[in-house]
Amino acid sequence: MSNDNCTGDIVTHLKNWNFGWNVILTIFIVILQFGHYKYSRLFYGLKMLVLWLLWPLVLALSIFDTWANWDSNWAFVAFSFFMAVSTLVMWVMYFANSFRLFRRARTFWAWNPEVNAITVTTVLGQTYYQPIQQAPTGITVTLLSGVLYVDGHRLASGVQVHNLPEYMTVAVPSTTIIYSRVGRSVNSQNSTGWVFYVRVKHGDFSAVSSPMSNMTENERLLHFF
């Protein structure tokens, strides 16, 4: 009889909460699937909020489980303590790497938990940032009728062939990688063509050049922090 009552309670609980969990999980699916900056800034902001809240939420739950099971279930205490320490370490690592990346690139993309590297392109006095997963060996820049694309992603319009930079940079938490222009095939008449950049050096450099500086482009890119 006790087992029947337990089963009945579980079925009743599922009936009462099934619709609510269905709605919550559907919202999570929409946020995770369409939470990209180019699709919807609202969903992207919600996605970042969920990711940022997961660390303190899991940490709080782990600490509570450790306290609740203290002196009654040491297996749960050990597991909860391990989860709390692991979450705290990952949280600290996130802030440390994000700060190091922000120190180089000076963009809010550095605080995105999904971003490991940022491509920095300066054209016509404007700096453009592109989040990527890892630093590439080479970067391909395409110019189609004055529209600038970096590895297939549109960055700017109204760009002429002579406006293309001599250098590009990619910032990662541990270093800044500088890419130099090594080859190109362009048509100046219709502002169409491609330019290829390869990495030439890396170090503790700023990934962002300052358009207000009187230094040359080369000097701006290579100045130390």
UniProtKB/Swiss-Prot annotation:
<feature type="topological domain" description="Intravirion">
    <location>
        <begin position="96"/>
        <end position="225"/>
    </location>
</feature>
<keyword id="KW-1040">Host Golgi apparatus</keyword>
<keyword id="KW-0468">Viral matrix protein</keyword>
<feature type="topological domain" description="Intravirion">
    <location>
        <begin position="32"/>
        <end position="40"/>
    </location>
</feature>
<comment type="subunit">
    <text>Homomultimer. Interacts with envelope E protein in the budding compartment of the host cell, which is located between endoplasmic reticulum and the Golgi complex. Forms a complex with HE and S proteins. Interacts with nucleocapsid N protein. This interaction probably participates in RNA packaging into the virus.</text>
</comment>
<keyword id="KW-1043">Host membrane</keyword>
<keyword id="KW-0812">Transmembrane</keyword>
<dbReference type="GO" id="GO:0039660">
    <property type="term" value="F:structural constituent of virion"/>
</dbReference>
<protein>
    <recommendedName>
        <fullName>Membrane protein</fullName>
    </recommendedName>
</protein>
<comment type="similarity">
    <text>Belongs to the alphacoronaviruses M protein family.</text>
</comment>
<dbReference type="InterPro" id="IPR042551">
    <property type="entry name" value="ALPHA_CORONA_M"/>
</dbReference>
<keyword id="KW-0946">Virion</keyword>
<dbReference type="InterPro" id="IPR002574">
    <property type="entry name" value="M_CoV"/>
</dbReference>
<feature type="transmembrane region" description="Helical">
    <location>
        <begin position="41"/>
        <end position="61"/>
    </location>
</feature>
<dbReference type="GO" id="GO:0019031">
    <property type="term" value="C:viral envelope"/>
</dbReference>
<dbReference type="GO" id="GO:0044178">
    <property type="term" value="C:host cell Golgi membrane"/>
</dbReference>
<dbReference type="GO" id="GO:0016020">
    <property type="term" value="C:membrane"/>
</dbReference>
<feature type="transmembrane region" description="Helical">
    <location>
        <begin position="75"/>
        <end position="95"/>
    </location>
</feature>
<keyword id="KW-0472">Membrane</keyword>
<feature type="transmembrane region" description="Helical">
    <location>
        <begin position="11"/>
        <end position="31"/>
    </location>
</feature>
<dbReference type="GO" id="GO:0055036">
    <property type="term" value="C:virion membrane"/>
</dbReference>
<keyword id="KW-1133">Transmembrane helix</keyword>
<feature type="topological domain" description="Virion surface">
    <location>
        <begin position="62"/>
        <end position="74"/>
    </location>
</feature>
<feature type="region of interest" description="Interaction with N protein">
    <location>
        <begin position="199"/>
        <end position="215"/>
    </location>
</feature>
<feature type="topological domain" description="Virion surface">
    <location>
        <begin position="1"/>
        <end position="10"/>
    </location>
</feature>
<comment type="function">
    <text>Component of the viral envelope that plays a central role in virus morphogenesis and assembly via its interactions with other viral proteins.</text>
</comment>
<dbReference type="Pfam" id="PF01635">
    <property type="entry name" value="CoV_M"/>
</dbReference>
<keyword id="KW-0261">Viral envelope protein</keyword>
<keyword id="KW-0325">Glycoprotein</keyword>
